[in-house]
């Protein structure tokens, strides 16, 4: 849940959102930051030197898109269907599914498939199988390797089905 739902946190939190994932337009790399005025004033002091601007067509397109809330409100069911499709397909592989909720990533345990590290497995998977995954160890400062990788299911169904077909052959 968002920190904005908790009064004690909302008054001192930055809420960061990505249009790309939220509105299923991955790759657009446009987002928002919401926070109390005092916090955003400080945030803008730093942000102005990190990011110059977002191109105008993206801003206009997103502003127009956001005027109709229906597509946004349909996204939970949209992503649930994709998660179910991908998880059901992964269940037919040797990869062990790990519980996921509230995300567009499916984590899997690879220990039953390989002795490679997460990172080496992901590199091998792209080169030899043609499927991309991210090693969870990439998110740890010490590279902690749990033999867990994540797949993004915020993709076209055809892409997911092609990936599943390849993963079944592992």
Residue ranges and their predicted role:
Residues 1-170:
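PLP-dependent class I/II
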């Amino acid at each position: 849940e968002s920190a904005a739902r908790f009064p004690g946190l909302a008054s001192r939190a930055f809420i960061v959102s990505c249009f790309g994932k939220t509105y299923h337009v991955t790759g657009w790399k446009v987002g928002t930051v919401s926070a109390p005025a005092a916090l955003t004033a400080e945030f803008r002091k730093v942000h102005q030197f990190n990011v110059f601007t977002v191109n105008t067509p993206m801003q206009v397109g997103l502003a127009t898109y956001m005027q109709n809330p229906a597509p946004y409100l349909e996204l939970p069911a949209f992503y649930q269907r994709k998660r179910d499709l991908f998880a059901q397909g992964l269940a037919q592989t040797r990869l062990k599914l790990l519980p996921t909720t509230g995300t567009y990533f499916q984590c899997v345990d690879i220990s039953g498939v390989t002795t490679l590290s997460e990172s080496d497995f992901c590199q091998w998977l792209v080169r030899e199988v043609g499927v991309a995954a991210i090693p969870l160890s990439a998110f740890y400062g010490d590279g902690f390797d749990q033999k867990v990788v994540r797949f993004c299911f915020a993709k076209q169904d055809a892409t997911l089905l092609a990936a599943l077909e390849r993963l079944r052959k592992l």
